[in-house]
Amino acid sequence: MKKYLTFIFLISFISIEAQDIRIPIDTSVTTNSEVLINNQKITYQAKTGMQPVWNDHGEIIASLYYTYYKRTNIKNSSKRPIIMSFNGGPGSASVWMHIAYTGPKVLRIDDEGYPIQPYGVKDNPNSILDVADIVYVNPVNTGYSRPVVKSGKKLDKSLFFGINADIKYLAGWLNTFISRNNRWQSPKYIIGESYGGTRVMGLAAELQNKQWMYLNGVIMVSPADYKVLRTGSALSSSLNLPYFTAAAWYHKMLPDELQNKDLLEILPLSEEYAINKLIPAMAKGGFISDTERNEVADRMSYFSGIKKDVILQHNLDVPKDYFWKELLRNENGFTIGRLDSRYRGLDKRLAGDSPDYNSEITSWLHSFTPAINYYIREHLKFKTDVTYNVFGPVGPWDNRNDNVREGLRKAMAQNPYLKVLVQSGYYDGATTYFNAKYTMWQTDPSGRMKDRFFFKGYRSGHMMYLRSEDLKKSNDDLRDFIKNSSSNGKSAKY
């Protein structure tokens, strides 16, 4: 298809230094293209480039790389929904959802998500561009985004690399973006994957309270709630059991009574046991009776596919990395993946407490790294010698004062329009689906807003959209959420 290229240089006199290569801090390249989505021809404009981050004194402190897709074969785009998209890490570029989930192009992989050569991209017939425009944002030190440091000064990491600093500067950047692109009338959504779930929970409150930008929806894809994950408590450990069940079922390691049933039939059984029996038992720690300890180990073995004696050796608290090593150890010697436990790996030794590597990451990087570099240069026509950071240096990350869950609750209480969608893969061992459910349940302990929370699960891993069947299903779920979270002319009141 023919593409029309326009260069727009806004404030190109100041530049940032990265790898001793200078990048304009305020520049964009525009191309036009089309894609067939749900058998409907969608024409669109893609604008990609750099937009500055300003501090409270009006000084430029960074420039963020973004890609903005806007449908063009409609009458009025200013009132069309817009989705602001982030990945996680922290330290990850927005590459994953950009060229594998919601964008108009997806990378070339097979139906189960495994890489295919030659690497590249193809049209995405499931993209949500038919119902919403999308901007993919790369935080500082990811993609081509970089800090701007005055000559003779050192980088002040506290401006960017922490849970609250990250939220603050990104909210300001989004305000600028919305103003520049005339999107204040649009219904607004933010979507974040993995740590991006933490990010968008915080952004919902920051945008509303500091930028006066009210959202229609917050979408969390495989969200990481570190307030639970960091505790190492009986609670956080118990929430892993339903994931163990899903992974063991996929690899056919469960007892026949469970293995012969469908996954969605057995997960509620594992969830119920985790909530009603396992959490209370593990809370007793070393004071649990021998009888109860053995009963619990029996049931954990039943639901996890690993041996009772191994569970007892771990005092009922089996780490996930040990599970990835142990599940198939005596079956065929493979390990299973962390972010997607359908993937198998091969270690140097059968012995050990954790896999040598994450088998799914090596597979994904086969595809994503060449695909995004090719796509940006050859399709979007943005060319630079600066390295595209799929994963960038953002440490040490300041995790103090993590109040994002409460921030989301307050934002929802103050904004009757605001709804939340959580999407998780059952085979995700990093940010498990049951942990995501728990986060959703705990966000509003009163239960008075529970009709504004929605959960969707998929037979995939962390990036459920890599599986062809779930790419369609998850995008359709996004469409439904956008439709159902539209105000439809209703007043914002209780």
Regions found by a protein language model. Give the residues of each.
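Catalytic-loop region of hydrolases
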Residues: A18-I82, A100, A492
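N-terminal cap/lid subdomain of alpha/beta-hydrolase-fold enzymes
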Residues: G58-L159, W441
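A catalytic-pocket lid/entrance helix-loop region that shapes and gates access to the active site
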Residues: P104-R108, A204, Q208-R299
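Alpha/beta-hydrolase active-site loop
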Residues: L129-D130, P139, L159-I178
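Alpha/beta-hydrolase fold nucleophile elbow
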Residues: R183-Y195
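Alpha/beta-hydrolase fold catalytic core
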Residues: G285-T431
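Short alpha-helix in the alpha/beta-hydrolase fold that links the catalytic acid
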Residues: L418, T432-Q442
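Catalytic histidine-centered segment of alpha/beta-hydrolase-like enzymes
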Residues: R459-D470
